[in-house]
Amino acid sequence: MKKKINRLSLFILDVLIVLLIGVVIFILLTGGKVFYIGTTLVRLQGVENPLTFLFILGIIRYLLSQKAPFLGLATIDKNTIAERCSTLCNRLFLGIANLETYKIYRIVLLIIGISLIIKIFNAYCFYGFFSGDDVEIHEMTFSYLFDWGTKAWNIRSPFYPMVFIFPVQAILFSLGINEPFYLIFSGRMVVVLFSALNLYLVFIIAARLFKSMPVGLFSMFFLALSKLHTTMGSSELPRTIASTCILVAFWLMLQEKNQRILVPVAGMVLAIGASIRFSEAIFLVPAFFYLFLHKRLRQAFSLVALFVVAFAFINYLSDKLYWGQPFFSLKNLVDFTILKKQSTRGFQPLLYYILSIGLWTNYFSFGLMLCSLRQNLKKIWIWVAAPILLLSLFPHKEPRYLLPVIPFYCIMVGLSVWGLLGRIYHNDFKIRIQKRISTPILVLMIPLIGIVIQAQKEPRFGYLVFLFSGLIIAVYFLQDKIKRNNGVPYQREKVNASNIAVMLVLALLGVIIFEVNGFFFRRSESGVEMARFLRMQKDNRGVAIEEIWRAGGRLYLWQKPLLLNIERSLIKERKHFVSSIKGNSIGWVGIRDNSLSRYGYASLLYDFGFKEVKFSEKIRLETYRLFKKENNDSNQEMDCSD
């Protein structure tokens, strides 16, 4: 009877493990779903929680029985797993090493093609907005297309939107296509194409730098796999194109012929990237020191000189033509962010980018990148370390700011993986490790894995990752020292290539899971659906919307006589909300569902004569609710006290 209960328990555990694996695969393929079970909203998004439960169940299953067959079908043997991982790595190494050049280029085109399809899907299906920045880019181009007479925020340089986004929109507009949806999509397609160029540039740069096409292939693969590259490459935000300029500049610096001409040209290309996004000027630092460390000092100074001249010329001319004053946006940016310190974006700690590794990449590829430090990196590390250090000094930090760093980061990861595959194939590992993992280290490692999984979505877990990692290292050396002092050193053995193969396969699996998990670029689709609905209404009364940028600002609603933004920071104040919706000029109010329920504004809107209008049947994570004022004569004096 006891054996039957144990078998049943193991079978139930196995079934739960299979179900969780199915959930993870479902989320990776669909991006997850939001749905109702009765009246309860269920959010099945992100693989972190299912993977954490899967890891816990796996540990329990292992502790209960190592010999019982999984689902009663087959026993999972550690030696068999190691052997199969080793075989897989060896086949991968030989397969790529023996590829003919034309086949490698076919794979390159295949990867670029798949990446393009994913980005086009993102750009078309997720038609919302990521931040106010993307809205402002289109507002600058739309103001010319539709002759608004007003322009966007005056701290944004017109160089990027007017040179890269405006031309394709102007062509469509001249053909009679004036629907904002298609104009916005066309702007995003420009960035999608540049992201494809970035993939090819990484391939040729890595292949040339390390004289290895497999390294170039792996580097490009990891860039295509990058969630940051994929999501930002399917938006209208400028860093993807700025990244193209940085990669082109680096490629020019690698050329062995005509260096006196090409290096100054590289400086001008860097200036274009910095003019697209001012913060990219920091890449002048790694460019200078890269040349300096290669003893090309004269070329380094010529690069800086041409950068300064080109940057000044571009910003003088673009601001003069758009704003009517040279350096207008640059001066306003310095005044707003540095002198007056009026930026409301928030401030992050100095170590934010290290603690938020899971947001801009993943801990598995980060570990692989660290492995590359033992190889000859050709000084490429400076293109990763210097920008991260400099960006860490800025008060406001976001994962997307590291987008131009990602290509160089992926080159380091690609070099590391190809090197490890070669060493596994040749069994070329000279390091020695202790035969058995001690209990204290094992006790620390188990929660560390769970913490790493959760740290992929929550930077606060980053502190625990480094805390537990430090404790493991400290315990390892402390135990070693105690044993040596007692005259009983640890028994050590040469590391087995098959064990490294297992770790590499698991690391690559982790990279794929956590990067693909971030592929689907959901934005403010509900807000845009609401704006498109309002655009079709003949009611010309004003519109008040919470965080109006989520609805596209003026992009869809510029014909409305009044657009009022209800600031998120003030919506909790009842008096502010009432002042926003009060009066006959406002006929429509759009408010996020969580704000409506949190502050109880539904009854208040009904009291002012508003009734809810359905504009979409889709269930989304971030949902807007739309209210229309039916009674224009409603001027009741309401109790506005908090």
Please annotate each region the language model reported:
Residues 283-346, 350-367, 381, 391-394, ...:
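Membrane-lumen/periplasm interface segments of specific transmembrane helices
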Residues 120-128, 320, 445-472, 476-480, ...:
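Catalytic lumenal/periplasmic loop and adjoining terminal transmembrane helix
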Residues 19-28, 103-131, 225, 272-276, ...:
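Transmembrane signal-anchor helices characteristic of membrane glycosylation enzymes that use polyprenol
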Residues 185-210, 248:
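Transmembrane-helix motifs of polytopic, lipid-linked glycan transferases
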Residues 356-381, 386-388, 426, 439-448, ...:
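Hydrophobic, aromatic-rich transmembrane alpha-helices
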Residues 137-140, 144, 152-180, 193, ...:
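Short hydrophobic/aromatic helix or loop-helix immediately within or flanking a transmembrane segment
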Residues 84, 88-91, 250-270, 282-313, ...:
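Perimembrane helix-loop-helix junctions
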Residues 130-132, 156-157, 228-241, 398-399:
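Short acidic/glycine- and proline-prone juxtamembrane loop motifs at membrane-interface regions
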